[in-house]
Amino acid sequence: DKNIDIPTSETIWSIKGNKKLTENSPIKLSWTNDQGITFEKEISLDDKYLFSIKQRVINKTSGKYDFYSYGQIIRNEIPDIIDFLILHEGLIATLDDELIEEDYDDIQEKKFARTAQKGWLGISDKYWITSLIPPQNKEFKTTFDYKDKFRANFIATEPLELGPNNSIEENLQIIVAAKRVDVIDGYAKSLAIDKFDLVIDWGFLYFITKPLFFGIDYFFKLLGNYGLAIIAITICIRLVFFPLANFSRSEEHTSELQSPCNL
């Protein structure tokens, strides 16, 4: 709400209670503006890469205010990029089931903006992803732009109404993770994040490359050697297609036998 002071990047927060963030001990931050409205954040961390932020606004005044959920990731400059066809490094999102990949130079030329009901957004490196997961099933607008810095952000299109002597609460999740399949798929499943597995660059033949990866990974864990794992998955593929190849050869042989009869 433009009529009140809200926290900024320069706000000095007070820490309530525990001062060290660990997987077993969240930290709580608090700040009260001159109008008497208190903003609270509780930041917790799991045993891997997930930051959960519970945001609360407490209104002890007689006024009524509207607040919009908001989150932003900033990259100060373009990193060293590997120019590889199937590897995307830049701004990324899935919005209502559609994968969005924007290169840094594209965003410098033109801003990207779209509204959606579900999805996630972030900035992708070769081995790492930093991502925001907005509150789901609530319409939000995602924007990728460049103003001296690369910015990936979202803002809710509908406000949360805060009445007199009342409070509101909203949750935001941030994942700063290595692009490991077990980690990414684990968060996609446990947090019900739509198409979060597309964080990993599977290429255009996603429906083939991902099952092949799981097959090779299975045999690697079983045999302890990637060379043997590749041989094993190759044998499995040949066994799957053997009946089809055998049928094709039988048909060809039958055709050769029929040719003299036709003469």
What is each of the regions a protein language model found here?
Residues D1-D194:
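Soluble non-transmembrane domains of integral membrane proteins
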Residues P243, F247-E251:
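Pre-Walker A segment
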Residues E252-L263:
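Single conserved hydrophobic/aromatic residue that forms the stacking wall/gate
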Residues I4-T8, I175-A229:
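Interfacial loop/helix-cap signal at membrane boundaries in integral membrane proteins
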Residues P135, F220, G224, F241-L244:
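Hydrophobic alpha-helix feature that most strongly marks membrane-spanning transmembrane helices
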